[in-house]
């Protein structure tokens, strides 16, 4: 693994042409045809690497990878990167399409109205996907992972905040709690659920649920809606106890070599038509308010894509917790060792 990371770092620290844009993104995150359109409009070449968790992305950057122009971390990782002075300023005047964003998503990233450090790009809600042809679900709850009849046929995300967050929501706690007792209770709950899991994993849950290798998986709504588009036997729900919400941001790292093209790409993604087209590809919702009106009604009215207010009221956006967040690392270590 380390050898792979060092090789990746070697590759991404090499020099590159001025008309090349390097992205570090989630898999299946931007419609390929949109990237081709950008390349044609700006006479450039886009190169991208994919990551599967915020933790792996952050670890690679901390090991010294310095070849990226735009990165797409989730909120709590963005906050960590900002605190560690890893991000460059994004100039507001270079983003005329910023007006398309819902203003409620901007206060956390705004600085004096002149520049920002991040642009809200996508919103994901974690929940549960299951095979309708293999099992019945009578209660749309995180408690499904306690079902012994599905032992060995379920997975949960290999992600500290998502897995522990699911247990915290099930117990009625905040996914951002710093109460040691509550976090330990969540770890105990997760250890109980672990007895029924095939494993914790974040890379193969889409394929696993599509092939029926797994009958129930914890996953992100967009990923699971992509599977449902191709497989009518798969369904997805956001549990009644609430979801763990991640807001992904476009950021420009301090070392970016092509900031002009990086700004152009972010502004391109903020175009209402582009954002709507990408939403239809990824099935992840967007803070782009102007794009919502361009979506088909089937997407506008899909509760898995745009959850009802009663679910949102019970859900939590994952926050960076600073050093106190080590309580989660300790709890996760206990779960993994159990």
Question: Where do the protein language model's features map onto the residues?
Answer:
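A ligand-binding cleft/hinge motif common to bilobed small-molecule-binding domains
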Residues: 77-80, 210, 215-233
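Early extracytoplasmic/lumenal segment of secretory-pathway proteins
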Residues: 14-81
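Extracytoplasmic ligand-binding site segments that recognize negatively charged/polar headgroups
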Residues: 67, 72-78, 82-196, 201-210
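Ligand-binding "clamshell"
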Residues: 82-90, 112-116, 226-238, 300-302
